Curated annotation (Swiss-Prot):
It is a peripheral membrane protein. InterPro entries: Dsl1_C (IPR021876), Dsl1_N_dom (IPR021875), Dsl1_N_sf (IPR038442), Zw10/DSL1_C_sf (IPR046362). Changing residue 425 to A: Loss of interaction with RET1. Transmembrane segments: none annotated. This is Protein transport protein DSL1. GO terms for biological process: endoplasmic reticulum to Golgi vesicle-mediated transport; ER-dependent peroxisome organization; mitotic spindle assembly checkpoint signaling; protein transport; retrograde vesicle-mediated transport, Golgi to endoplasmic reticulum.
């Protein structure tokens, strides 16, 4: 200072003129000069210089704040960010600022916090109202915008590079970054964090766009269109159906592909491709395969060309996105489009669907015209053939079992019961006859009354069994009414004729086509299966009529192999369950004899078994008629007489005198109530009934009376061991029994020698 101003006196005089260094105004006003010490002035000068320096530092803060505001106003957003960063750095490190009062610092910091929020809000507004315009029904992207009152030109790529690098350098928001951590206002800090998270979620990860596209592609009732000039995707509802629906779905997906390929920046194309690509690949391939019959309706189908175009665009999308989490070569779709064999197979699928619909329409007829019965000729086999299958050799009783086994092997229906399977029915599940009857009644109650009456009238089946005849075991439930038709004719519904027409039409549609033979056979079997399933559902209580219809249908077309198999299974399943019920009822009755032999209840036989046999087995099989009806009736009688009764009784250890009468009465009831005139000419039927009736006759007799029957030749149908087994079961081991057995051996042995 002295070097600059050597004249100290002059300096002092000049300073005395400055009112700031006067001690008080009164002294000056009095005109008295203040004598100041030079050292005092220097001290004061130092203080003023320090204050000036502080003010100069604080002025720097003001300049930075103005710089931030200016950059923000002119949308120099990156410069604004760096200016704000410099301001925050000075606020952390500037000693002059840190020496200011807390209130001063708090005021400055709060104001700077608003600058943070203002900058982020500007970024958010430019994204939401500038580059992107996303509504519930549209997505529009603009790669370059003019923003603000000065129409500042902003490029999307540059803008997003800045946002990503400065705010999300690690791909996510860092809550420890200076931009958030340096803020002191919790409210402003939370607002900044929320807006940055929204920017990250919706404009970096494009989650909202991903969701909108994902929820609209490959979905019927949704449509997407792309307006190239405005670069906008428009989402709307669609009411198209069938082929138009497929076309709408495909064009919607093409619109999305075009938008991603031509309308987006690389960074966003890559993001959407990464998020949606695997879904695109899977759903597009799946959709094309599921709708191939529509897409490949003709060799030059426009949908086929559309799929090919989309397939190529999807391949381009993979390449232009440079993602690694999915691939799409397009080969699978292209091979599918070029596969003519597949085209013909899909055409077959379409024809099959239409024919199944035609079958369904038959049963949807409110008039039920398919139930109308017509009389057709019954195809019958030679009666001798039946006798050969089930008959027995009169001269050799022992050969009966061998012949029986041979019949079973030759019998395609496999209903004859072999000796090794005698206990098979005992191994079956327990069947509650009461539950079965209740279930049947409940099912019948569900049917319309008119339909039930119509079937009853058509079948002429008396549903009401005479109570008096059930109460009295002596009253016979005769089972020889086979209807009013002659033996060479039978009634069928309209179903066989209707299906024959459908079947013929189905086959003729591909008479000269290139459809794979195995595939055609598979679909033809599927047509038959569908027909049989619908028939079964509509014949739930008239299975015998269904069998008659199916048998007639098979006679008209022997190549209906699937229907033939299902028809056989139908009859076997129905009879199988009924056989089980009969077997259990017999066992109930035999158990009643053992437990209460002197006063047994006959309800199981009279109230349940006999009516059940007549109504559920004999009558339906009589209605079936033909070779099958006779064969199954014979099989049932063999099962009833031999397996259910004879073999079960022979398992007993001993038969008391009282139970011998009970058993004889049971056999008598069964014989009298299974007199079937349809089988009257069958030799095997006559022998079976005669042997069973003979058993019922000798059961209550004394040994002497039984031996008289033996001497008279009444046991010619019984093998020697079988007859002796009965005698040992009925009578105690006495000399009389031993003599009787010896006589049987002697006479039978002599007869064999002769």
């Amino acid at each position: 200072m002295e070097s600059l101003f050597p004249n100290k006196g002059e300096i002092i005089r000049e300073l005395l003129k400055d009112p700031l260094i006067l001690k008080n105004d009164s002294k000056r006003s009095n005109g008295s000069e203040l004598e100041l010490d030079s050292s005092d002035l220097l001290q004061r000068e130092a203080i003023l210089a320090n204050e000036l320096n502080i003010l100069d530092n604080l002025k720097t803060f003001l300049n930075l704040i103005k710089e931030v505001k200016t950059n923000l106003n002119i949308l120099e957003l990156e410069n604004c960010y760096y200016s704000l960063q410099s301001l925050r750095k000075k606020m952390r490190n500037n000693a002059a600022y840190l020496k200011q009062s807390f209130n001063f610092q708090q005021s400055i910091s709060t104001y700077v916090d608003t600058l943070h929020l203002e900058l982020v809000s500007t970024l958010y507004k430019i994204l939401t109202n500038g580059f992107w315009k996303i509504t519930e029904n549209s997505i529009q992207f603009t790669p370059t915008v003019e923003w603000g009152k000065d129409k500042v030109h902003i490029e999307y790529d540059t803008f997003m590079d800045f946002v990503a690098q400065q705010y999300f350098p690690k791909g996510s928001l860092d809550n420890q970054a200076w931009f958030i951590l340096d803020m002191t206002s919790a409210d402003s800090q939370e607002q900044v964090r929320a807006k940055l998270n929204t920017i990250m979620k919706e404009y970096m990860n494009l989650s909202r766009i991903v969701s909108m596209i994902k929820n609209s592609i490959f979905i019927s009732g949704k449509e997407i269109s792309y307006e190239n000039e405005k670069n906008i995707l428009v989402f709307s509802k669609s009411s198209s159906h069938g082929q138009h629906c497929v076309s709408t779905v495909l064009t919607s997906f093409e619109a999305v592909c075009d938008f991603m390929l031509d309308g987006l920046a690389f960074r966003d194309r890559k993001t959407l491709s990464y998020e949606l690509g695997p879904l695109f690949n899977t759903e597009f391939t799946k959709f094309v395969k599921n709708n191939a019959s529509i897409i490949l309706e003709s060799l030059d189908s426009p949908l086929k060309n559309l799929v090919s175009v989309i397939n190529n665009k999807l391949t381009r999308l993979v390449a232009k996105s440079e993602v690694t989490n999915w691939t799409h070569s397009g080969k699978e779709i292209q091979d599918l489009l070029m596969n003519k064999q597949l085209y013909y197979n899909l055409l077959l699928d379409k024809v099959l669907e239409s024919h199944i619909s035609e079958i369904r329409s038959i049963f949807e007829d409110p008039k039920k015209s398919w139930q109308n019965l017509e009389v057709v000729e019954l195809t019958t086999s030679n009666t001798n053939t039946m006798s050969e299958k089930i008959g027995k050799n009169d001269s050799d009783v022992q050969n009966e079992k061998e012949l029986h086994n041979a019949v079973s092997k030759d019998d395609d229906w496999n209903w004859e019961v072999e000796d090794d399977d005698a206990d098979a029915w005992g191994d079956e599940i327990d069947v509650n006859i009461d539950d079965e009857e209740e279930k049947t009644n409940q099912e019948k109650e569900k049917e319309p009354e008119e339909e039930e009456n119509a079937w009853d009238e058509a079948w002429a089946i008396d549903e009401n069994i005479d109570d008096a005849s059930l109460e009295n075991g002596k009253e016979h439930l005769k089972a020889h009414d086979v209807g009013s038709l002659d033996k060479d004719h039978i009634e069928v519904t309209q179903l066989p004729k209707l299906f024959l027409a459908i079947s013929q039409n189905f086959k003729s549609s591909f008479a000269d086509s290139h459809v794979d033979e195995q595939y055609f056979a598979y679909k033809y079997n599927l047509l038959q299966t569908s027909y049989m399933a619908m028939c079964t559902a509509n014949f739930s209580h008239n299975w015998c009529q269904l069998y008659v219809d199916m048998r007639y249908l098979i006679e008209r077309d022997e190549k209906l192999y699937r229907i033939k198999e299902l028809t056989r299974n139908l009859l076997e399943t129905k009879l199988n369950m009924k056989y089980r019920i009969v077997c259990q009822l017999i066992r109930h009755q035999l158990t009643e004899f053992r437990e209460n032999e002197r006063n047994p209840s006959w309800d199981a036989t009279i109230e349940k078994l006999l009516p059940y046999i007549l109504k559920e087995i004999v009558r339906p099989l009589q209605k079936i008629r033909g070779e099958e009806g006779s064969r199954y009736l014979l099989s049932f009688l063999n099962f009833l007489y031999n397996d259910c009764v004879t073999k079960e009784i022979l398992k007993w250890q001993i038969i008391s005198e009282v139970n011998s009468e009970n058993l004889g009465e049971l056999v008598s009831l069964l014989v009298n109530n299974t007199d079937i005139q349809l089988l009257a000419k069958e030799p095997s039927y006559k022998k079976m009934r005669e042997k069973f009736a003979t058993m019922g006759k000798f059961l209550p007799l004394h040994l002497k009376e039984i031996m008289e029957m033996f001497y008279n030749g009444d046991f010619y149908l019984f093998a020697t061991d079988e007859l002796i087994q009965w005698i040992e079961l009925l009578f105690a081991d006495t000399p009389l029994r031993r003599n009787a057995i010896d006589d049987i051996y002697e006479i039978r042995g002599t007869a064999l020698d002769d």
